[in-house]
Amino acid sequence: HNMTIESQRGKSEFDRLYNSSGTRKIKRGNKSIKVSDTKLLSGMVKMQTKHAGYKTAGSTQNLQDAAEVFKFAADNSKAEWRLDVYDDNGAKTAVVATKQSEDHVQNADEAMDGLAVEGNQVVNIHSHPNPLGTKGGSSDDMRNAKSSPARNAVYFKANQTLYEYNSTRSQIKGMSANTADDILRQMGLK
């Protein structure tokens, strides 16, 4: 696991997510992000503990926080991550999830399991951490896109690009995704 969460537990109005240093003595790395919704990371820690450290997911209506956590986690780990957004009559909720696997991530239904998320999926993004991996949707990704009206994209970590795909085309277009704002803007959420 490549992340360290520091919860301020009432001492602060935000949580901070750190990358891992890669050593056992000093767990916390030198990169971090602030997360305003203090329930997002604490919820992810609870779920991760329940699943022996391998699977986690969290939800928030703060799309900025969700995009920040997704991008930071994708950029600072070897695992695939996903970011889904649901629309319930104008109220949008994001889900951030991982299975801590380098070559697949849980589907949207599995990621939502145990979370109070309502509405229709409007965005489905997952990361491809392998620099030699697919720049766009894999054959499995495209097959899964058939049943969803959501906008689908792969975040390719190596070049920080979102590659939109659908059920018939692995790569419709590439879009710069250097920041969480870029991700939200490119997917029509900002």
Name these PLM-found stretches.
Residues 34-60:
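Short, compositionally biased leader-like segments
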Residues 91-97:
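Amphipathic coiled-coil signal-relay and dimerization helices
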Residues 74-79:
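A short catalytic or substrate-binding loop motif that flags glycine-/basic-rich loops and adjacent residues
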Residues 58, 99-110:
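Surface-exposed ligand/attachment interfaces on beta-rich extracellular proteins
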Residues 2-44, 107-190:
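Active-site-proximal loop/helix of nucleotide/amide-processing enzymes and allied scaffolds
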Residues 51-72, 133-140:
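Charged, amphipathic alpha-helical segments
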Residues 67-68, 80-84, 123-127:
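Mature secreted bioactive peptide module from preproproteins
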Residues 80-88, 152-155:
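Short beta-strand scaffold segments in enzyme catalytic cores
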